[in-house]
């Protein structure tokens, strides 16, 4: 029996994995070090996708000579190798080793018998150790004990050296989108300045500006993380988590803004009903908690030995379901707004069409990523698609709300200093909040100024207030305004 499979070498520790030609899934770290002490005979260390002719593994392993002998196994991502042995409880060590083809140099024996493994015996405080320079999986008769340090690289370029093959291009993509979103944010601030001068800077537009600003911060932290990662192969996981939280926050702010606009807030009405406020609060709380659960699930339960996409989890599928529910709500809100205010069709028709695509883009992307994109290319492709979806959403809204006379889709036509009119008296002398309102006047009875964001009153209905202005005759049904001057024509930029 060949030395590697001698009875004395009963335990093996496979992982380091992925090989030269098969470009496997993803890896978390390109510089890995630590101490391993386990009773298990098969322990996963890390995962990395090497490029043919460029991929290189530099390592240092040390373990007590009494634990001899241990091996490092390099698995291809071929279905007959890594997927066939990982978490295969019905296979023992020899069975897991048997799928490897020795002629491909996939086994590194960490003993002095193999000079190319770089092993030598050293003594330290009376204990003899085997110190080697090359490796990845090990065997012993009573568990594993190992100090390890590995540097996994793809070429010498700053943009590829520490990156797994499935991560190529992520840093360049993030930098590109960061510059684009900075431009969008500054344009939104400029448009906001113009709108504020015309008293048309409404809460929903401020939410758009906030979403764009948070998106910029998110991409900035992603670039910092990947830039540091490209430098040292380690990165700062806290920075990446912060970037993900900001990315999710931007998405949630934008989603809330879309639902509010669909319901006509700041376009056809100045307030959301009490029932609508409660529904929005419950929905957004549920959506936020699900996002948090998804991040925790990804950090704590994703198996680094497998390639798992963010949405490939119960929390991820829950988010997809909430996205579909949000679209149904969005459709209903837009249809109701159009039914009561058909004069708003120039805004709502393209608005509905554009964001129908956006609502479906996220779940469709998740399904394609889970089932249609090769694992070794998934992370970089999904990153680009996800950022493209966010860019589409922000770019469309920026164009639709640009304050230009040529913009026929401009949604805002009531000043922030105006209060809404009283409607035509309904049965019993009550006033209707939904019917017979003049064009470009809000649907609810009261509209507060939002020159400064007032999030505490965003969705609530204020108590009736006595107006200091003279009131019209009870049966006149004429609207009352604090400022009766129209906003005036929009100027081209």
Curated annotation (Swiss-Prot):
It comes from the Eukaryota. The keyword Transmembrane applies. GO terms for biological process: G protein-coupled receptor signaling pathway; response to pheromone. GO terms for cellular component: membrane. Glycans are attached at residues 35, 444. It is a multi-pass membrane protein. Its main location: membrane. PANTHER family: INTIMAL THICKNESS RECEPTOR-RELATED (PTHR23252), TRANSMEMBRANE PROTEIN 145 (PTHR23252:SF24). This is Transmembrane protein 145. The gene is TMEM145.
